[in-house]
Amino acid sequence: MANVTLYKQDGSENGKVELNDAIWAVEPNENVVFDAVVMQRASLRQGTHAVKNRSAVSGGGRKPWRQKGTGRARQGSIRSPQWRGGGIVFGPTPRSYAYKLPKKVRRLAIKSVLSQKVLDSDLVVVDGLNFDAPKTKAFATVLDGLKVSDKALVVLEDGNEVAAKAARNLPNVKVVPAEGINVLDVVDYKKLILTQSALQKIEEVLA
């Protein structure tokens, strides 16, 4: 099994931690990762676009002129699509863009991006992130000790609200629970910082 350095909160080394090869040593599949990112971004779309068709636009209930005898083209409503201010034909309607990839594909995608972090030496495992109070400065000090200056995704165990609040004002840091780790976030952030408890939770879910 592969292993990475385990760090203390102050940035000093605290031995090694073993990684499950079935999760962290998978050959990255770029096509699957791309599909997963597109799926997640599609689900983020609001899909609230809408226009008025001729049944929704106001007015136009009366025939503008008689059918015959005027010399003009016959018209039934001033809200027909060919009129200025008329209804739109086949316009966009509210819809959901969300869809799901097969479960095996989604799992391969998350394993691929996690394995890529190991290959790129962008995985940082900390034995714990414990703070007396949710202070942004305290969390920034931890990042300095870990020598993390890039965008960082911090994955915490459940219930660590103090650490989550301490990090939320840092501009290049995002905090997610272990159950909420996803392909899009891992791809978007350069460094992946895990607590040891979060690492165990991820391996329980994905193993």
Swiss-Prot record:
Gene Ontology terms for molecular function: rRNA binding; structural constituent of ribosome
A Pfam match: Ribosomal_L4
Keywords, comma-separated and alphabetical: Ribonucleoprotein, Ribosomal protein, RNA-binding, rRNA-binding
Gene Ontology annotations for the cellular component aspect, listed alphabetically: ribonucleoprotein complex; ribosome
Cited SUPFAM superfamilies: Ribosomal protein L4 (SSF52166)
Top-rank lineage group of the source organism: Bacteria
GO biological process terms held by the UniProt record: translation
Region of interest (Disordered), ranges: 49-86
Matching InterPro entries: Ribosomal_uL4 (IPR002136), Ribosomal_uL4-like (IPR013005), Ribosomal_uL4_dom_sf (IPR023574)
Stored NCBIfam families: rplD_bact
Protein family per UniProt: Belongs to the universal ribosomal protein uL4 family.
Role played: One of the primary rRNA binding proteins, this protein initially binds near the 5'-end of the 23S rRNA. It is important during the early stages of 50S assembly. It makes multiple contacts with different domains of the 23S rRNA in the assembled 50S subunit and ribosome. Forms part of the polypeptide exit tunnel.
Binding partners and assembly: Part of the 50S ribosomal subunit.
PANTHER family on file: 50S RIBOSOMAL PROTEIN L4, LARGE RIBOSOMAL SUBUNIT PROTEIN UL4M
Protein name listed in UniProt: Large ribosomal subunit protein uL4
